[in-house]
Design a protein with these regions (language model features):
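Outer-membrane beta-barrel transmembrane domain signature
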Residues: 25, 181-217
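A structural signal for short secondary-structure junctions
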Residues: 69, 149-152, 174-180, 201-205, ...
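Outer-membrane beta-barrel "beta-signal"
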Residues: 51-54, 208-211, 239-250
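Single conserved hydrophobic/aromatic residue that forms the stacking wall/gate
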Residues: 1-9
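C-terminal outer-membrane beta-barrel translocator/porin domains of Gram-negative envelope proteins
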Residues: 27-184, 192-194, 244-246
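Long, low-hydrophobicity, solvent-exposed regions enriched in small/turn-prone and acidic residues
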Residues: 7, 15-16, 116, 190
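Transmembrane beta-barrel architecture of outer-membrane proteins
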Residues: 14-18, 90-92, 154, 205
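A subset of solvent-exposed loop/turn segments in beta-rich extracellular surface proteins, enriched
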Residues: 12, 16-32
Length: 250
C-alpha cells in the first residue's frame, strides 16, 4: 500500500508493506556462532517496512529531436525503518541527478550520485546483516542489491546519449519508427563490508551502452512514444551483462 501527494515538480509521501518477514527472534546459534535452524526458521506476518521519502524535480521540455531534457535536475531523500521489529537497522538514502546538453546538437549528458547508510547500528546479530534494507536507486549496471552493502555506500553514474538516425517511417497505422539512439554509460560504487578483519572498503564499477529504438504504435500521438531498449555492460566482477526492456509512455 502506498500513498503520495504532489504535482509534476514536487513529490512527497510514505509507503509501507505488509507481508511475510523472517522470524529473527526464533534464531538459534551453534557453538561456532553459525545459525543452526536456518532451514526451519519460518516467517511471520506483520508490518515490516515503512518508507518515508521526499523529492523535487525540475526539467525543461525537450524539443522533438532531443534525446532527453536539455536542462534539469532531480533530488530525492528517503528513510526506511521497521516499526514492528526494532532489531533491524534503519536506512538513510539520498539521490541526485543533473541533466545538461551534450557536446553536439540534440545530445544529452546526465550525471547522478547516490548515498545510503544504515543507522542505529546492527541491532540484529551479525549473521543477519543480509536482512538490512538497501536502496536500489543507483546501482552499477550489471550488479544487484545482493552485491552491495548499505554501509557508507556512495555511487556515481555518467551517461551520454546521442541520436544515430531518424528512420521516420514504418507501416501506416501499425508502427512508426521515430528514432534510433545510443547511450554510453559508466557507473562506480564504493561501500564498507564487515568481515573477519572488521570493516573493509570494496569498489565496484561497470561500463557499456544502451541501444534505444523510439517508436509509435497504432496511431499513437507523437508524444506517446514507446522505447525498446537493448543494454550491454561489463561489470568489474563476472561476465558481461545483457538486458532488454520496453519503456511505455504511461
Amino acid at each position: 500500500l502506498s500513498r503520495g501527494l504532489g504535482d509534476v515538480y514536487k513529490r512527497q509521501g510514505w509507503e509501507y508493506s505488509n507481508g511475510m518477514v523472517a522470524d529473527v527472534d526464533a534464531i538459534r546459534y551453534d557453538a561456532e556462532g553459525r545459525i543452526a535452524n536456518l532451514q526451519t526458521l519460518g516467517y511471520r506476518e506483520g508490518l515490516h517496512k515503512l518508507s518515508l521519502g521526499i523529492g523535487f524535480s525540475d526539467v525543461v521540455r525537450a524539443a522533438y529531436r532531443d534525446v532527453g531534457t536539455p536542462w534539469g535536475y532531480t533530488l530525492w531523500a528517503g528513510y526506511d525503518l521497521n516499526p514492528e521489529n526494532r532489531n533491524f537497522s534503519d536506512l538513510v538514502s539520498a539521490y541526485a541527478r543533473i541533466y545538461t546538453p551534450g557536446f553536439f546538437r540534440h545530445n544529452s549528458l546526465s550525471v547522478a550520485a547516490a548515498y545510503q547508510t544504515s543507522v542505529g547500528g546492527y541491532r540484529f546479530p551479525s549473521g543477519l546483516r543480509f536482512l538490512g534494507y538497501k536502496s536500489t536507486r543507483l546501482l552499477p549496471r550489471g550488479f544487484s542489491s545482493s552485491d552491495i552493502s548499505s554501509n557508507n555506500y556512495l555511487a556515481g553514474s555518467v551517461d551520454y546519449q546521442f541520436p544515430l538516425c531518424y528512420p521516420e517511417g514504418g507501416i501506416s497505422g501499425v508502427i512508426y519508427f521515430k528514432r534510433i539512439r545510443l547511450n554510453v554509460g559508466a557507473d562506480y560504487a564504493r561501500f564498507q563490508e564487515f568481515g573477519s578483519r572488521g570493516k573493509t572498503w570494496r569498489d565496484i564499477y561497470s561500463y557499456g551502452g544502451d541501444l534505444l529504438l523510439d517508436l509509435n504504435i497504432l496511431r499513437m500521438s507523437a508524444a506517446a512514444t514507446a522505447t525498446v531498449k537493448l543494454s550491454l555492460y561489463k561489470p568489474s566482477e563476472g561476465s558481461c551483462w545483457f538486458g532488454f526492456g520496453l519503456e511505455l509512455p504511461f
